[in-house]
Amino acid sequence: MLKPLGDRVLVEIIEEAEQKTAGGLYVPDSAKEKSQRGKVVAVGTGKTLDNGTKVAMEVKEGDTVYFAKYGGTEVSLEGKNYSLLSERDLLAIVE
C-alpha cells in the first residue's frame, strides 16, 4: 500500500454501477464521467506551515469523500483504482 506524504490522501475510487441509456444500450467505460466519490484508505501526516507548525488532516481513514473531478493522480494497485489527492482537492465528507 502507498503511504501519502504531507497533506495528501489516498482515495479508493468507488465505481459507479453499469450505466444503460433509455434505449437499453450500455454506456462504455470510455464514455462515462469520471467518478468523484471514494473511500479514504490512507492519509499523510498533515501540511507543514512555513513556521514549522503541522496542520492536522480533517479526513481520516474510512471516510467517504467527494473530490474534484480532475484533481489528483490516478494509481492502480492490486486490481483497484485509487486517486492520490491533496486534501484541498477534497470537496466534502459524507456523514
UniProtKB/Swiss-Prot annotation:
Q: Name one GO cellular component term.
A: cytoplasm
What binding partners and quaternary form does the record give? Heptamer of 7 subunits arranged in a ring. Interacts with the chaperonin GroEL.
Q: Which family does this protein fall into?
A: Belongs to the GroES chaperonin family.
Please name the GO terms that the record assigns under molecular function.
ATP binding; metal ion binding; protein folding chaperone; protein-folding chaperone binding; unfolded protein binding
Q: Where does it live in the cell?
A: Cytoplasm
Q: What is its main location?
A: cytoplasm
Q: Which keywords, in A-to-Z order, does the entry hold?
A: Chaperone, Cytoplasm
**Name of the featured protein:** Co-chaperonin GroES
GO BP, sorted A to Z: chaperone cofactor-dependent protein refolding
Q: Which organism is it from?
A: Deinococcus radiodurans (strain ATCC 13939 / DSM 20539 / JCM 16871 / CCUG 27074 / LMG 4051 / NBRC 15346 / NCIMB 9279 / VKM B-1422 / R1)
Biological role:
Together with the chaperonin GroEL, plays an essential role in assisting protein folding. The GroEL-GroES system forms a nano-cage that allows encapsulation of the non-native substrate proteins and provides a physical environment optimized to promote and accelerate protein folding. GroES binds to the apical surface of the GroEL ring, thereby capping the opening of the GroEL channel.
